[in-house]
Amino acid sequence: MTLEDKIENLLRPTIETMGFQFWGCEYLPAGKHSTLRIYIDKDEVGVTVDDCGKVSRQVSAIMDVEDPISNAYMLEVSSPGMDRPLFHPEQYKAYEGQEVQVRTSSPVMGRKRFKGVMSQVSESDIAVEVDGELYEIPFSLIDKANVVPQF
C-alpha cells in the first residue's frame, strides 16, 4: 500500500462526511519543502476557497494525530480544477473520449509521455490515441494523468 493509499483511507471518511468527494491526493517529497496535496470535489456546484479551508482544518487535525508522514510538509487542499488529475479507474472512465495527458514510469511502445484522446478504459489499462496511433497504457505504469481542458 502506497503512502497516498494510506492517506486516502485515513481521510476519505471525514471528507465525505463533510459533504465532499475525496478526488485524490499526492505527496511530493522535497525535504523540508515537501507537499501533501489533497483534491476535493463537490457535485455540480464545485469547491470554494472556504470549502478548502474547512477541509484543510479537519485534515490537518487528523494528520497531526495519526502522523502518517514523519517529516515536515505543507498541506494543500484544492479542487481538481479543469485539468483535473486522474487517480482511480472510475475517474478515467468518466473522462473516456476526452483528451488526456499521461506520463508513465516505464516506456510504453517507446515513449513515456502521451497527449491524445483516451478512447477506451478497461479494468487494467487505458487506450490513448496519439497522432493516429493507439497506445494501451496499463494503470500500473501511469505516474500521472490529467484531463486536458477544452476551451
UniProtKB/Swiss-Prot annotation:
Keyword terms, alphabetized: Cytoplasm, Ribosome biogenesis
GO biological process: ribosomal small subunit assembly; translation
A Pfam family annotated for this UniProt entry: RimP_N
Annotated InterPro entries: Ribosome_maturation_RimP (IPR003728), RimP_C (IPR028998), RimP_C_sf (IPR036847), RimP_N (IPR028989), RimP_N_sf (IPR035956)
UniProt cross-references to PANTHER family, sorted A to Z: RIBOSOME MATURATION FACTOR RIMP
Family: Belongs to the RimP family.
Name under which the protein is recorded: Ribosome maturation factor RimP
Organism per entry: Hydrogenovibrio crunogenus (strain DSM 25203 / XCL-2) (Thiomicrospira crunogena)
Gene: rimP
